[in-house]
């Protein structure tokens, strides 16, 4: 690709109308531990001749040094970057007259390794390790370092930094999205589509949201949990409606709850405990709005209960409550959202399949309530609680993920901790003994991503 005119002079000395205008910058995202992928939109004005290619340039935010990559269309990959260093990117189009005007700078991105680890019950190959042997300590899933999002249910689903979708584990209802019902014991790419941004795995089905705001589902559908106004299983991803405004999704045992970009809350599927939040126990086979509010911020689901926060930091719950998992100081189920206490500082939430809930405040304190038969509340006993209780006095918790009967949590120092039921070694501590208080998992201090895994008997986590 030449950046000079035929007469040998560089384009900088020519009429700027001859070279292309600036492309419109999109986003820069991690493609590998040493490369980034840059998206953009071609300029409307191509200058004096057709565009022949593009040059994307990554600039270190620390000292301004640059490195470039070329391509014929969006996205362009820039390789040879330094691991752990922040960059922004610009893009310029090229025609026969030379290099055009550079775009505005992209978002900042830092190349990093994102390794996926798994442990615990390996039924149907749910750990992705190529076999069905249980593991009681974290084991890396393959050698890839480009995992970005993960979810665990009766199937495991994940996205990579290139936007591709992968799945493995149990597939009896087509929940791996591979157009068949054969189990897989190692990650398999789901179709050829990219731009997958968010995934969630329920009892026997999966959902995903793409970067364009569309929502897709596949797998079991006996209660209408896929949202298609029927109960027909799908063995590959199918778009749910035509909307492009979905921003967040969570799959429970046989129901689904989602938030749109306008802050409205929607639910569908099985509803025997009022877990859809619509004031009754009627199942729905397509999305139905929960109330009229437009201030919903975050939502998670357990087997049969739902937990959500609003933009004002308040915490709300509904659904099954036989174990006190709603945190309302009783064991009565609720069919519509009810606020938990008066706090307005809830920042991260998680719901466990067996009937327990965890939440972190903006101060970094971890609170928990509900069923405690395996010590999953982390309170040094096995007594259930029906209202929130703080786990110790620490204020350094950053992430929490409830599974069927155990918990994973990360601290601000990047360490990973686990507690609760330890059948199959799902706590990752090298044994199968239950723990009723937090115990550190190994010595790594780079745990960055925990999954939604409310129905899981195993563990997944990403280290970066």
Question: Which positions does each model-derived feature cover?
Answer:
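Short, flexible loop/turn segments at beta-strand junctions in immunoglobulin-like
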Residues: 78-83, 192, 342, 393
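Short beta-strand elements bearing conserved aromatic residues within extracellular beta-rich modules
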Residues: 54-56, 165, 215, 265, ...
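Beta-strand-rich modules
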Residues: 78-100
